[in-house]
From Swiss-Prot:
Summary of the knockout phenotype: RNAi-mediated knockdown is lethal in larval third instar (L3) stage.
Entry annotated with the keyword Transferase: yes
Species, as recorded: Drosophila melanogaster (Fruit fly)
The protein's name in its UniProt record: Cytoplasmic tRNA 2-thiolation protein 1
HAMAP family: CTU1 (MF_03053)
C-alpha cells in the first residue's frame, strides 16, 4: 500500500520528515524545508536589503545547503542581498585540502565569489604542524579559536555586513548540553542566540539553519543532488562535542522532539544578576573581538611561537575550580581544628 503525501498534492510520499513525522513527496518536502528557513530569516530579521553577506563555506552538507537555499530564497523573495563565500583553510592534509575542492565547486554552481584564508597566512601555522607540537588532546581548542577569529578577519577583508554560518538545530542542542555539562554559564547565555556579535567593532553572525534538523539537511542535499564533502575531520574523533552528539542521538531515539526541547530550554534559561558575565571587547594585540586581554587566539599563538604550546589551555572547568575551592576550605577548617585541639 502506497502512502500519499500529507500535503494532499496527490503524489506518493517519498520520505518521512524527522522533524514532524509527516509523510511527504520530495517536492513538498523541499517547499516545507525552504519555507521554514525563510520564516526563520524573516521572523528574526536576520538580513536587510542591500547587505553583503558572507556564507561560511566548508564544503560540508550544512554550508552547502545554506549556500544553495540562501541563493534560492534571495532570488525567490527578493532579499536584495549580495552573497559571497568565505572559506578557512586550517591546513589539515587529507581533509581540508579535499573539501576546498568542493567549496570551489559550490562557487561555480552558485556563481558566488569565493575568498579562502589559511591559518598559514594568518598565523604562520597549520593544524598539521600544531598537532605535531601538542598531540591530539587539545587540537580542537586551537582550531576552534583560530577558526572563529579567521572568519572575523575574512569578513573584515571582504567588507561584509554579516556572516551566515551553517549551524543547525542539532549543533545548537549539542552546544547547550556541552555548556551545561561544563558549567559554562557565559557561553550558555548566548549559544542559542540566532544572532551573535554586532557591536561597534564586530561583524554579526547569523544562523539561518538554527531550527533545521541535521537529518533533514542531509535529506535535502541528497534529493537535490547537491555536491558536498562528507568526510569527518581526521582530528575530530577525540572532540568533546562527539560525546555530546552521541548522547543526543540516544535521547532522540526515545524522544524525537528532544532537539527542539533542548533549544527551547536554552532560550528560556535565566541567570541571577550576581552571575558574572564576561564583557566582550577588543583585543589590545590583534584588534579583534575578545572577552579577555589578550584574546585567546593571541595567547595560543604566543605559546606556539615560544615553544610553549600548552600555554592558555590549562584552565580548569567551573566544576574543577569549585572542587578545589571546597578542598581548600576543608583543609583550612581541619587546620583550625588541629590548632584548637593543641590548646
Amino acid at each position: 500500500m502506497h502512502i500519499i503525501c500529507k500535503s494532499q498534492c496527490g503524489n506518493r510520499a517519498a520520505l518521512k520528515r524527522p522533524k514532524t513525522g509527516d509523510a511527504l513527496c520530495k517536492e513538498c518536502f523541499f517547499a516545507a524545508f525552504e519555507a521554514e528557513i525563510h520564516h526563520t530569516i524573516s521572523s528574526s530579521n536576520l538580513f536587510r536589503r542591500g547587505e553583503k553577506v558572507a556564507v561560511a563555506a566548508s564544503g560540508g552538507k550544512d554550508s552547502t545547503v545554506l549556500a544553495h537555499v540562501l541563493k534560492l530564497l534571495n532570488e525567490r523573495h527578493n532579499y536584495g542581498l549580495e552573497l559571497v563565500l568565505l572559506s578557512i583553510d586550517e591546513g589539515i592534509t587529507g581533509y581540508r585540502d579535499d573539501s576546498l575542492e568542493t567549496v570551489k565547486q559550490n562557487r561555480d554552481d552558485y556563481q558566488m565569489p569565493l575568498k579562502i584564508l589559511s591559518y598559514e597566512e594568518l598565523y604562520g601555522w597549520t593544524m598539521d604542524r600544531i598537532v605535531a607540537q601538542i598531540g591530539r588532546s587539545n587540537n580542537c581548542t586551537f582550531c576552534g579559536v583560530f577558526r572563529r577569529q579567521a572568519l572575523d578577519r575574512g569578513a573584515k577583508l571582504l567588507g561584509v555586513d554579516s556572516i551566515a554560518t551553517g549551524h543547525n538545530a542539532d549543533d545548537i542542542a549539542e552546544t547547550v548540553l556541552m555548556n551545561v555539562l561544563r558549567g559554562d554559564t557565559a557561553r550558555l547565555r548566548r549559544c542559542t542566540s540566532i544572532r551573535t556579535g554586532g557591536g561597534e567593532d564586530t561583524i554579526p553572525r547569523v544562523k539561518p539553519l538554527k531550527y533545521s534538523y541535521e537529518k533533514e539537511i542531509v535529506m535535502y542535499a541528497h534529493y537535490k543532488k547537491l555536491v558536498y564533502f562528507s568526510t569527518e575531520c581526521v582530528f575530530a574523533p577525540n572532540a568533546y562535542r562527539g560525546h555530546a552528539r552521541a548522547f543526543l542521538k540516544d535521547l532522540e531515539k526515545v524522544r524525537p522532539s528532544v532537539i527542539m526541547d533542548i533549544i527551547y530550554s536554552g532560550e528560556q534559561l535565566r541567570f541571577k544578576d550576581t552571575v558574572k558575565k564576561p564583557e566582550r571587547g577588543t583585543c589590545t594585540r590583534c584588534g579583534f573581538v575578545s572577552s579577555q586581554q589578550p584574546c585567546k587566539a593571541c595567547v595560543l599563538l604566543e605559546g606556539l611561537n615560544r615553544g610553549l604550546p600548552k600555554l592558555g589551555i590549562g584552565k580548569k572547568s567551573k566544576g574543577e575550580r569549585m572542587i578545589a575551592k571546597q578542598n581548600q576550605e576543608l583543609a583550612l577548617r581541619e587546620r583550625a581544628n588541629l590548632v584548637k585541639n593543641d590548646f
